[in-house]
Design a protein with these regions (language model features):
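Accessory, non-catalytic peripheral segments of nucleic-acid enzymes
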Residues: 37, 42, 250-381
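Catalytic-core regions built around general acid/base machinery
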Residues: 62-74, 196-207
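A conserved active-site cap/scaffold subdomain adjacent to cofactor or substrate pockets
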Residues: 201-204, 208-263
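His/Asp/Glu-rich metal-coordinating catalytic cores
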Residues: 55, 82-220
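Divalent metal-coordination and catalytic microenvironments
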Residues: 8, 28, 48, 63, ...
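Short beta-strand segments at enzyme active-site cores
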Residues: 41-47, 78-82, 169-173
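Alpha-helical scaffolding segments of alpha/beta enzyme cores, especially the outer helices
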Residues: 30, 61-69, 93-96, 155, ...
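N-terminal active-site segment of His-dependent metallophosphoesterases
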Residues: 1-68, 75, 364-369, 373
Length: 381
């Protein structure tokens, strides 16, 4: 069986005020062209279909148009799971009806979820759609307390493996942060409000291949556990990343081979650095269509710098001054980045600074429970 692995479309994303829906549509057309050219038997999308829980109408329309082509025109089965950006209940709308046409959407976590079985010339292949699952959700559904994403994932996997023949070929879809994988700063939304959000790669040992989503960099955790990365570059911290999809071939014995095929965005991201006068004097036609982050090295602000620079670089999305930051408030710069700390860590530090004492163990436990409940309520909006 041959299938295409993609993830993290983030449809409806607004990047520094720029609506990316046109760029997203163009890259989805590339993915459909790749699927047709490589003659895949299925497409798997490992979460974060939308960028937010309530997506804009143009994002819903783009997904609808894309799935209509894949399912009704090209007759390619599609499996999709919810990620941490998606509202699982909204994504799940019509799932039972769509499954008749081989569009398999797994939104909310369910204790009664069944694997998807597709067949090739060698027999059945079972897909386990491990939709994004918070520990509190796993606790409520399993009746056993699950305090980490790793424990929640273990519970999910047990539910699916109990329904799949032991020696059958198996593929997992999971939206998770695997321990040791490379995270992109300022790119992916943290999975946990507090506590451990990482999962161990050994959880996926029973599967012939695991199609991962969540991290935006295309990377291999092992030969059979891989991230394909996001549809587009969604942060200037991703500027050096190469976006791609994986074409996975599964043979009769369950051995895999993977080909990684690149995706090309209509507008690439680039970072331009230098003093104002030099940047104005330079001619860089290769950057004319790029979305830019401009870092000025001038020691004083330039009046109307962005508008003036846009006569040379028409797509400036972010402008900052390197020297002004360097000579700014050093105390604030030395504070740990929120992305390097959990919400619990940040609140504990805030509490310590404002009350001159640390949280007690009981207070820490109450905070953890409150943040878990808040995360659950946010996903239900």
């Amino acid at each position: 069986m041959r299938f295409l692995h993609t993830s993290d479309w983030h449809l409806g994303r607004i990047f520094h005020g720029m609506h990316l829906i046109t760029d997203q549509a163009a890259v989805l057309e590339q993915i459909m062209a790749i699927a047709l050219e490589t003659k895949v038997d299925a497409i798997v999308v490992a979460g974060d279909i939308y960028d937010r829980a309530v997506p804009p109408t143009e994002a819903v329309s783009l997904l609808d148009a894309t799935l209509q082509k894949l399912i009704l025109k090209y007759r390619i089965p599609v499996l999709m799971i919810a990620g941490n950006h998606d509202n699982p209940d909204r994504l799940n709308f019509g799932q039972a009806l769509f499954a008749e046409n081989k569009l398999f959407i797994y939104g909310p976590v369910s204790a009664s979820a069944s694997p998807v079985m597709l067949e090739d010339k060698f027999g059945p292949v079972y897909f386990a759609p491990l939709t994004y699952c918070e520990p509190l959700t796993a606790t409520e559904l399993s009746g056993t307390k699950q305090t980490t994403h790793d424990a929640a994932l273990k519970w999910q996997i047990r539910q699916f493996l109990g329904q799949i023949p032991t020696h059958a070929r198996k593929v997992a879809l999971s939206h998770a942060f695997v321990t040791g994988a490379k995270e992109t700063p300022d790119s992916e939304r943290p999975l946990a409000a507090g506590g451990s959000s990482q999962v161990d790669i050994t959880n996926f040992a029973p599967f012939n291949y695991t199609a991962l989503g969540h991290l935006h960099a295309c990377q291999n955790c092992s030969s059979t556990v891989r991230y394909c990365g996001s549809l587009l570059k969604y942060s200037f911290s991703e500027v050096c990343q190469k976006k791609a999809v994986h074409i996975v071939d599964l043979d009769a014995e369950g051995k895999i081979s993977v080909e990684t095929l690149p995706l090309t965005a209509p507008h690439e991201l680039a970072v331009v650095k230098g003093d104002f006068a030099r940047l104005m004097a330079e001619s860089r036609p290769e950057l004319a269509e790029n979305y830019l982050q401009v870092i000025l090295t001038d020691t004083a602000p330039i009046l109307d710098a962005k508008n003036k620079l846009e006569t040379v670089y028409p797509h400036i999305l972010q402008l900052s001054y390197e020297q002004l930051v360097a000579h700014g408030d050093l105390d604030s710069i030395r504070k740990p980045s929120p992305r390097q700390s959990t919400t619990e860590d940040l609140f504990a530090e805030f509490f310590r600074q404002t009350t001159t004492r640390s949280l007690t163990d009981e207070e820490k436990n109450l905070l953890h429970l409150a943040l878990e409940q808040l995360a659950k309520e946010r996903r239900q909006l």
